[in-house]
Swiss-Prot record:
<keyword id="KW-0479">Metal-binding</keyword>
<comment type="function">
    <text>Iron-storage protein, whose ferroxidase center binds Fe(2+), oxidizes it using dioxygen to Fe(3+), and participates in the subsequent Fe(3+) oxide mineral core formation within the central cavity of the BFR protein shell.</text>
</comment>
<keyword id="KW-0560">Oxidoreductase</keyword>
<feature type="binding site">
    <location>
        <position position="94"/>
    </location>
    <ligand>
        <name>Fe cation 2</name>
    </ligand>
</feature>
<feature type="binding site">
    <location>
        <position position="130"/>
    </location>
    <ligand>
        <name>Fe cation 2</name>
    </ligand>
</feature>
<keyword id="KW-0406">Ion transport</keyword>
<comment type="similarity">
    <text>Belongs to the bacterioferritin family.</text>
</comment>
<dbReference type="GO" id="GO:0020037">
    <property type="term" value="F:heme binding"/>
</dbReference>
<feature type="binding site" description="axial binding residue">
    <location>
        <position position="52"/>
    </location>
    <ligand>
        <name>heme b</name>
    </ligand>
</feature>
<dbReference type="InterPro" id="IPR002024">
    <property type="entry name" value="Bacterioferritin"/>
</dbReference>
<keyword id="KW-0813">Transport</keyword>
<feature type="binding site">
    <location>
        <position position="51"/>
    </location>
    <ligand>
        <name>Fe cation 2</name>
    </ligand>
</feature>
<dbReference type="GO" id="GO:0005829">
    <property type="term" value="C:cytosol"/>
</dbReference>
<dbReference type="GO" id="GO:0004322">
    <property type="term" value="F:ferroxidase activity"/>
</dbReference>
<feature type="binding site">
    <location>
        <position position="51"/>
    </location>
    <ligand>
        <name>Fe cation 1</name>
    </ligand>
</feature>
<dbReference type="InterPro" id="IPR012347">
    <property type="entry name" value="Ferritin-like"/>
</dbReference>
<dbReference type="InterPro" id="IPR009040">
    <property type="entry name" value="Ferritin-like_diiron"/>
</dbReference>
């Protein structure tokens, strides 16, 4: 089914963001794990995999609309050098995705592509869940300090990899 070029463009823009998020969350997972934040690292790993599933849905939709998914470029990574910077970097990426998906859903609605609009609605709901989690973690970090936050997010030695 031939899709609207503007919709395919927006789907590829979302793919650009999701592919960057996959890489950013995965690198943050590895860094956090190395720093001893094993529980938070596990969450970052899960987020990376979820973003990969988002990318897969976008690729599927682009192909269905007879477009070509652009996997050649990904959004620039924001890599934190400590736990606070990791959370802030991830939050900035989620804010960017939310803004893009809101705009994309409106374009899809105007062009009558309600299935792509629904996909953007699903992505938007997931990104807002990520935003809530990250904002909560940053609030918690500010309230209890990095040392206590580290204790909450470190697994006991016998559970660590």
């Amino acid at each position: 089914m031939k899709g609207e070029p503007k919709v395919i463009e927006r789907l590829n823009e979302a793919l650009f963001l999701e592919l960057g998020a996959v890489n950013q969350y995965w690198l943050h997972y590895r860094l956090l794990n190395d720093w001893g934040y094993t529980r938070l690292a596990k969450k970052e790993r899960e987020e990376s995999i979820e973003e990969m599933h988002h990318a897969d849905k976008l690729i599927d939709r682009i192909i269905f609309l007879e477009g070509f998914p652009n996997l050649q470029t990904v959004s620039p990574l924001r890599i934190g050098q400590n736990v606070k910077e990791v959370l802030e970097a991830d939050l900035k990426g989620e804010y960017d995705a939310r803004a893009s998906y809101k705009e994309s859903r409106e374009i899809c609605d105007k062009l009558g592509d309600y299935v792509s609009k629904q996909l953007f609605d699903e992505l938007l709901a997931d990104e807002e869940g990520h935003i809530d989690f990250l904002e909560t973690q940053l609030d918690l970090l500010a309230k209890i300090g990095e040392e206590r936050y580290g204790q909450l997010n470190a697994a006991p030695a016998d559970e660590a990899e």
